[in-house]
């Protein structure tokens, strides 16, 4: 018996050494490596939807890397893979895509099926960035940008760097959307892309309730939403009299929320603290010299932020009747989860107050 065990052990070890100790891997040239994925739909009738999934794949050449877009069209997202494989000369490799771009039409139908098929595959890239686009996602994937092997590479960088301005967050990864989708008291937003004469551009954010897109807001409202919802980004606030007289203030925002409940009604107190520097002053030169003038400017900017926040809250509560600020999550953490409360409805009828505090820490290098 011992001889048999020893013989089998030697045989297994020999096979392990002969095969190199691991399964044979395929070379990159034999694989279709994705740069980005685009999700579109086509209406084939009153109750029939055709899913169109496009893959932007790298083409490796001796001196440069390019990309090519192939699409699959079928009645289910899974079937599009089979349809697409009939048109490409390499095996498709899942898990390296940089961006997932969803057309507005698909987003309005719902994106749960997209997330399901992505996360059912253990090789899927859960850190790929997600965005919604106007028009067809395939058109954006096919757009050529000088200096980049694919438009997906450019869009990835564009979304990542967006957090340096407009108070954008970095919570646009696939895993971020997946986590928020079924979390109590949480909705999510995604960057909204449009095509311009200069190429793709972030034009605001798409608003989601559950897994469906219910609206879109422009970049100015997006700045306010970002401050109110995450309070972790950076952006510019401007006090302006006319085209020649203005002050630009570049600041980092931090948010704190307090929640109270009385007779079943919720009240939320949002505190925004902005700290930063004046990067352009064409309005009041006394600000850099006079403490009283600086305090006056800080108060004026605080009031401007509060006014803009209150306008957005009115739109959120009356027009969308949804919670894009994750206030329901705050209330659920304090008063209990799984109580059956519809936090979107509760927030639409809640009292929400905003207090902004602006602090000027620096004023550039001075005047010359």
State the predicted function of each range.
Residues 2-368:
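Membrane-proximal alpha-helical signals and transmembrane carboxylates
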């Amino acid at each position: 018996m011992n001889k048999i065990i020893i013989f089998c052990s030697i045989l297994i070890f020999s096979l392990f050494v002969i095969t190199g100790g691991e399964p044979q891997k395929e070379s990159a040239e034999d694989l279709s490596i994705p740069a980005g994925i685009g999700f579109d739909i086509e209406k084939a009738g009153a109750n029939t939807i055709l899913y169109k999934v496009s893959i932007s794949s790298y083409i490796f050449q001796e001196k440069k890397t390019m990309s090519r877009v192939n699409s699959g069209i079928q009645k289910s997202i899974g079937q599009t893979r089979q349809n697409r494989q009939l048109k490409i000369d390499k095996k498709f490799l899942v898990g390296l895509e940089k961006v997932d771009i969803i057309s507005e039409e698909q987003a309005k139908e719902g994106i749960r099926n997209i997330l399901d098929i992505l996360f059912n595959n253990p090789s899927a890239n859960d850190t790929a960035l997600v965005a919604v686009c106007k028009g067809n996602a395939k058109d954006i994937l096919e757009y050529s940008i000088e200096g980049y092997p694919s438009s997906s590479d450019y869009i990835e960088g564009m979304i990542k760097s967006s957090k340096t301005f407009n108070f954008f967050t970095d919570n646009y990864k696939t895993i971020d959307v997946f986590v928020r989708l079924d979390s109590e008291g949480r909705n999510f937003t995604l960057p909204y892309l449009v095509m311009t004469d200069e190429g793709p551009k972030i034009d605001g954010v798409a608003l989601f309730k559950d897994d469906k897109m219910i609206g879109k807001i422009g970049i100015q409202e997006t700045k306010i939403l970002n401050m109110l919802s995450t309070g972790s980004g950076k952006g510019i606030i401007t006090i302006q009299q006319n085209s020649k007289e203005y002050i630009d203030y570049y600041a980092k925002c931090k948010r704190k929320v307090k929640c109270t409940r009385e007779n079943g009604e919720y009240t939320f107190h949002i505190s925004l603290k902005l700290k930063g520097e004046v990067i352009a002053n064409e309005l009041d030169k006394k600000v850099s010299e006079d403490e009283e003038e600086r305090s006056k400017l800080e108060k004026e900017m605080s009031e401007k932020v509060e006014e803009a926040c209150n306008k957005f809250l009115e739109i959120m509560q009356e027009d969308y009747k949804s919670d894009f600020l994750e206030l329901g999550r705050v209330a659920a953490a304090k008063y209990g989860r799984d109580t059956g409360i519809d936090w979107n409805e509760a927030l639409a009828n809640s009292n929400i107050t905003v207090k902004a505090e602006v602090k000027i820490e620096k004023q550039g290098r001075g005047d010359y």
